[in-house]
Design a protein with these regions (language model features):
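Ser/Thr-rich, Proline-interspersed low-complexity disordered segments
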Residues: 4, 11-23
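Intrinsically disordered, low-complexity Ser/Thr- and Pro-rich stretches
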Residues: 8-10, 16, 152, 157
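Compositionally biased intrinsically disordered regions enriched in Thr/Gly
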Residues: 23-66, 71-76, 138-139
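Generic alpha-helical secondary structure signal
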Residues: 36-37, 81, 85-88, 186-189
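Active-site acidic/histidine clusters and adjacent loop/turn architecture
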Residues: 54-118
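Active-site-adjacent loop/helix surface patches within enzyme catalytic domains
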Residues: 100-145, 151-156
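Catalytic cores and adjacent binding grooves of peptidoglycan-active enzymes
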Residues: 131-138, 143-193
Length: 193
């Protein structure tokens, strides 16, 4: 415009402030060969010298899950290579259902001591060990083909109705209506819920 001309004042249209886009949470975890650093932490603990299974037979899983406060956290498992994708599918379904898992750490954090891992209600899989019956037979955990999920709420119960872990006593009886915390009922795997 030239000086002296009537200029129509235009009010700028305010631009809305950008809204943060939440990062989408991938519901499905990932599988990879066992990293060297993880191998080093497993050696002599969950991976003992043996002729049955090697690191190449296993996969390291990184899995998103809900904790007992319903926060999304990341856990890790080691499982057999040939079941890794199926395990990831199952945990994706558990994620979609908002199934809570208290913790999911490699058992090596507990020096590969199954009893201690269970005391901390740790969800774990691979641990080269024998079954607890005294038979000397290798456990399915020794092949990465068994997973203990929330072992406090889902304890191993002896035929006489008791278990080895006092912190799981409330859960030896499978009547979930008598359990004191809602999160415990949510973390149980069974048909009663």
């Amino acid at each position: 415009t030239k000086p002296g001309e009537d200029v129509q004042k235009v009010q700028p249209t305010p631009t809305p402030a950008p809204q943060p886009t939440p990062e989408p949470v991938s519901r499905r975890g990932t599988a990879e060969p066992i990293p060297e650093s993880v191998r080093a932490s497993m050696q002599g603990k969950s991976m003992k010298t043996n002729s049955n299974i090697t690191y190449d037979d296993l996969r390291y899983l990184t899995i998103p899950h809900y904790d007992f406060n319903y926060n999304v956290v990341t856990g890790h498992l080691v499982v057999a290579d040939d079941v890794a994708e199926e395990v990831l599918d199952i945990f994706a379904e558990l994620f979609d259902a908002k199934y809570p898992i208290e913790r999911m750490e490699l058992i090596d954090k507990y020096n590969a001591d199954d009893f201690t891992s269970i005391e901390y209600n740790n969800t774990s899989a691979f641990n080269y060990r024998v079954v607890s019956t005294g038979s000397g037979k290798l456990s399915n955990h020794a092949y990465g083909r068994a997973i203990d999920i929330n072992p406090q709420q889902n304890p191993y119960v002896y035929r006489n109705g008791t278990g080895a872990h006092e912190n799981a006593r409330e859960f030896w009886q499978r009547d979930v209506s008598k359990w004191s915390r809602e999160i415990d009922r949510a973390a149980y795997i069974g048909n009663e819920t």
